Amino acid sequence: MKKYILSLDQGTTSSRAILFNKKGEIVHSAQKEFTQHFPKPGWVEHNAQEIWGSILAVIATCLSEADVKPEQIAGIGITNQRETTVVWDKTTSKPIYNAIVWQSRQTAEICDELKEKGYSEMVREKTGLLIDAYFSGTKVKWILDNVEGAREKAENGDLLFGTIDSWLVWKLSGGKAHVTDYSNASRTLMFNIHDLQWDDELLEMLTVPKSMLPEVRPSSEIYGETIDYHFFGQNVPIAGVAGDQQAALFGQACFGEGMAKNTYGTGCFMLMNTGEKAVASEHGLLTTIAWGIDGKVNYALEGSIFVAGSAIQWLRDGMRMFKDASESEVYASRVESTDGVYVVPAFVGLGTPYWDSEVRGAMFGVTRGTTKEHFIRATLESLAYQTKDVLCAMEADSGIELKTLRVDGGAVKNNFLMKFQSDILDVPVERPVINETTALGAAYLAGLAVGYWKNQDEIKSQWHMDKRFEPTMEAETSEELYAGWKKAIEATKAFK
């Protein structure tokens, strides 16, 4: 009987189930979108029950369409939108409020108060993160402070907190396992990434009772089994968990110190494996846990770019410059340069290394001769410049010089962008055959735990390159272009 690993990829807008075979190839997949709730400007919420329903639906669809029986599943891996926060009743398993999504800014005031009280340095030291509404801790506090009776129930031990991975493991196991993995715990603002424990001082700062928190476990081990009625009568091991960006780093087989990947989605997330040491950042990066496996924990430096693929969508939908995102490459290639035009797509502020949420988008160097092609090319180039900003910060913090950059996500199909990325970084850019690296990473973590794959060396041998982009631009030219970008950033920051 052929066996497979089932990966559950729970994202910000949809849930997916993907079946992988022994070679790490996709056998079949199913996807289902769910509702985004915007109760107030800047707030983003999901219905956690609807997310659970979407997961059950994609599991059923994927298995039936692939004609795979539940007993053929060797293990389940879970990867998830990180930081998104669910608080539910321990007895009924019902959420007491919507899931507060990572993008949601509804806890910005709580963050300002904590900063004013002087907690920033302590938080930075213990968690590797900044005090920001992005992370889970302030979201839990908000729910306890704003939902009637919640704080009392929490203090009585009747409520549980989890990021989406915890919520799904809880539901799949029928409430038997309340766990999370190191990678997800490291995004909560409540976990000490050095001693690998929930931190009493951080919990006190956020007034979150410890009894609510899940047990933190390695990213690759059997956490529990599915209960019969959720999985067509089968008890399948739930065996791998990692946050989406860390799962992508694992799926790209970036196991060595100094290896890095960049995911070009709505935004960009770049992670560099720093091995078994947590490198503190002096340049606006986050220090995070990549994964815990075989009794060891790997750390990573992470940079976030807020606008990447969404800039291409903006050209298509907002500016109506083309009908299909793939056309952006055709237009950009029609001109030899942007003719001095720079686009800074700071639609929601700037991420790493600037962390400026007040600044807005801008365009520079426009003349009467500027065409649509120049504008499209400049927008695409901005993704590469922002990635270079992050890489410069990573190299400065880690003291490691990048040898190659592995890439994944929607925008990597754009050959113009990948070639320009390689030129501006002056390192080769490698695009893998399997672009679904997030789901693949979760599958690998689960497969290792159940013995489906032997070790990381076997996984490394399965990573195959689709295309390698080599830098050919003169150093002088790329330095000049990047200097122009830095000037554009400074000018953008001045205009608020």
UniProtKB/Swiss-Prot annotation:
Post-translational changes noted in the entry: The phosphoenolpyruvate-dependent sugar phosphotransferase system (PTS), including enzyme I, and histidine-containing protein (HPr) are required for the phosphorylation, which leads to the activation of the enzyme.
Regulation: Activated by phosphorylation and inhibited by fructose 1,6-bisphosphate (FBP).
Catalysed reaction, written as an equation: glycerol + ATP = sn-glycerol 3-phosphate + ADP + H(+)
Binding site for ATP: 12-14, 266, 309, 313, 410
Assigned EC number: 2.7.1.30
Pathway given in the UniProt record: Polyol metabolism; glycerol degradation via glycerol kinase pathway; sn-glycerol 3-phosphate from glycerol: step 1/1
Any GO molecular function: ATP binding
Keyword RNA-binding belongs to the record: no
Keyword ATP-binding: yes
Modified residues (Phosphohistidine): 230
The protein's assembly and partners: Homotetramer and homodimer (in equilibrium).
Family under the similarity heading: Belongs to the FGGY kinase family.
HAMAP family per UniProt: Glycerol_kin (MF_00186)
Name of protein: Glycerol kinase
Source species of the chain: Bacillus cereus (strain G9842)
